[in-house]
Amino acid sequence: MAFSKFGKMFRLPTIEIKKKTKQYNHLQRDVNPNDMWEIIGELGDGAFGKVYKAQNKETGVLAAAKVIETKSEEELEDYMVEIDILASCNHQYIVKLLDAFFFDNKLSIMIEFCPGGAVDAIMLELDRGLQEPQIRVICKQMLEALQYLHSMKIIHRDLKAGNILLTLDGDIKLADFGVSAKNTKTLQRRDSFIGTPYWMAPEVVMCETMKDAPYDYKADIWSLGITLIELAQIEPPHHELNPMRVLLKIAKSEPPGLDQPSKWSMDFNDFLKKALDRHPETRPTAAQLLEHPFVSSVNTNRPLRELVAEAKAEVMEEIEDNHEDGEDEDPADLTPVQAPTKDPSQTSATSLNGDHPHGTCYAETSMEIEEEPSTLESTKTPLKEQEDNLSDKFQVEDHDKPESEASGKASSSDSGIEDGKSTPTSEEDTKTVEASEPELPVQRTPTPAEEPEYPSETMEKYLEKPKEPEKEDHCEETQPVLKRIQLKDPNGRMSVVSNRSSFAGDDAESLVSHTNGRLSNRYSDVASDSMDISLNLSGDLSVNKEMGTISLRDSKKTLKRTRRFLVDGVEVSVTTSKIITDDEKKDEEMRFLRRQELRDLRLLQKEQHRSLTVLNMKLKEQREQMHRRFDQEMNAKKKYYYTELEALEKHQKQTIERMETEHSNSLREEGKRIRVEQEKAYQKFLDQMKQKKKEVKQEVEKMPRNQRKDTMKMKMNNYQQMRSDEEQKFIADQKEYLDVTLKSIISKNKHEISETERQCLLKKQNLVREREATLWDMEEKNLHERHQLHKQQLKDQYFLQRHQLLKKHEKEQEQMLHYNLRMVELLKARQQQERNRLPKIQRNEAKTRMVMFKKSLKINSSGSAAEDREKVKQFSRMEEKRQKAERLHQQQKHENQMREMLSQCDGNTRELQQLQNEKCHLLIENETQRLKSLDEQHNQQLKEWREHLKPRKKVLEDELTLRKRAGAFLQDDG
């Protein structure tokens, strides 16, 4: 029985805790979401949980189900901010909350499903940025959504392409309010360091180390500008930097812009300039930006409908294996690329209207439009002009560098990351063809029998342009590709517009010679002066060992993607070709690793934000406790003095009443005593009168009898008159004495009472002075205590910030270490590939050079066969020496590369340490300044309080003096 009672006692608190569980308006507890929603697929993996595609079992409505593992009520409260924001928002361009469940320690948030997907995923799928009309529509819709959010006192704080979803109707939906803030007033400021680094505004970045400069809703305007750059260039500014290291770049550098501003409209550039204003005070609001010419003219969302249609189009993929056995083949022929490109803001129009051919130097694009019959016109251009146009507008890339796919709709930059750094396409990388320029000659593809062979001189001119200084830095990588556009003629036949070149024999040799001629001098010190033919051959078939490329084609695969979709009843077919290399896999791996770093940062931010929230709640509770304690002490002191005053007044009243009673009694007793004495005196007076009467009678009796009667009568009349006068006088004297005596006693009593009242008044005033002095001392003490508490709380906040910063620095160093290891491993792998490839290259070269040397001996032979054999042996020995020198050179090159890589890694580590030290120093400086400012503020507050104390004392003394005078006046009147 006893144990059961104890069990009940111990179970009671648990029951009470369950009853106290906080209830939320928009969250269903203990309801299994699987009873109402069916999971039909997985959409992705977010920073805090997985996202599934779900369908309502009753209505069939689709939703994106965000499932988050939630371990405590505190974590649940963090996620409730997003749920409350979504529930309170009802806007065309903001995702809607359909349901929210908390079941089995899992939070399930059902959000409106957007079939178009996220914009960043669309850009990766199409391998290009968006065109300007599409960016305009997205920008306008985002501004309208932001205007609504800001009017609802909500700061999104995480705007980016990944949080912009598209519907099939061509509308956007802002999503992911996980780090958003809901304020109580529009101009409320925040100091939380939260968001994704690349899109953070400078004032948000500064909150990492400076909490005294909070930000407001205009931080979203900066993120909007960065997002527009991301839409145009696939990646945000500074994307080549580590997520942890980009923060200092944002804080110190000038506002970013487009990599190639000339390729975009002036309105776009001006819009970005206004949105990316470093000063939040002058940064425009969403309502002001809606009046900007960049978005004010947008009245349709057709560009987004086209984008969604292309992204959701049926895709047919075909992989072509380009493997060729290098040992059995002739030197590879490099086909010049006919790939005029267009401005990124014009590319989508090309894909839909088919007015101009376009593409890039490394992607094969085929576009097919089935609408109205079209004819194919061929313009005749002199060969020299063709060569100049081609040499100006085409570039050749190397085999072994990573290629980034260019879709049939864009000449996009490389969105991948090589060696952890971006390789964006600059103006030198990809030339564009403006609409005003004449189009390149269009040639029908000849049959194999009539396929023309370009003269070697023509091909030399094709490949001499990349040797120019401004091209070498950007066009060292060459890639043979074919540009093809397919159009249907009126008869329904497919015409293929292409530009092909075939090389054979000496033409190929001449082409290779001119392509790699700039590298021929590298090995000139190996051959003997007497071996001129050997030097010539070495120059003709030199190998680009620096870049690890060869003159023969490597084994590669080409991925062809064909998309077919309808736009306003027009069927559009876009074919893109992309050469698959190992480097692309590395780029994808680097992209994945960077996403992982961002995810780690997001988790770290969330954890830090939660810790900071817990600390702020603790500090707030401390302040409230101190305030309550101060109020309690103040009220206790006031109550004490109020009680003392009441007791003093009560004692005074009782004393006065007692004195009055005593005085009344004494007055009554004295009056009674005097009256008794006066009665006795009166009796004595009467006795004296009687005695005098007797004396008169005796005197009359002594007289003769005949005189007695008249004399008696006369004497008695005189006696009666004298007695009456004496009696009246005696009584009057007695009365006067009584009155004087009583008045004297009353006056004495009044004086005693007034003196007592005066003493009590002095005591009361002294008590009031003591009370006010005590309260003033308590106020001053409270000021000091409050200052000390604020100071300690500030130190606690900065201690947590330092702890979080050190934790973040450890994460940065860990990521930097992994990054450096990845770079070293990639370099080792590449060098191993080059070492493995070099023997094969040398065998192929030796075989080809030997064949050519023997041919030259046959042509120029002037000696015997023995001499020719000796020359062949000598040539073989020279080849062996040359190959040995090449291997040695490669080894030295690899060692230099490794040293440079290790030096670069050390430099990265030192730079990171320097940045971290700067952050720590900045945080310490800011803490010192805040503490100093807090001390100055306290001193100023104390000074003002003391200045205000003097008039308060004077007012009190004046009031007490007035009361004292009033009491004295009343006493005088009394």
UniProtKB/Swiss-Prot annotation:
Residue ranges occupied by any Protein kinase domain in the UniProt entry: 37-295
Biased segments, Polar residues type: 343-353
Residues binding ATP, per UniProt: 43-51, 66
Designated gene of the protein: stk10
Catalytic residue positions: 158
CDD domains linked: STKc_STK10
Biased composition (Basic and acidic residues): 382-406, 458-477
Topological type in the membrane: Peripheral membrane protein
Protein modification: Autophosphorylates.
Transmembrane segments: none
Any Pfam family hit: PKK
UniProt catalytic activity: L-seryl-[protein] + ATP = O-phospho-L-seryl-[protein] + ADP + H(+); L-threonyl-[protein] + ATP = O-phospho-L-threonyl-[protein] + ADP + H(+)
Disulfide bonds: none
Molecular function GO terms recorded: ATP binding; protein homodimerization activity; protein serine kinase activity; protein serine/threonine kinase activity
Species for this entry: Danio rerio (Zebrafish)
Entry's Gene Ontology BP terms: intracellular signal transduction; protein autophosphorylation; regulation of lymphocyte migration
Region (Disordered): 320-479
Family indicated by similarity: Belongs to the protein kinase superfamily. STE Ser/Thr protein kinase family. STE20 subfamily.
Protein name according to UniProt: Serine/threonine-protein kinase 10
Subcellular compartments: Cell membrane
Major place of residence: membrane
Biased composition regions of type Acidic residues, renumbered to the chain: 320-332
Assembly notes: Homodimer.
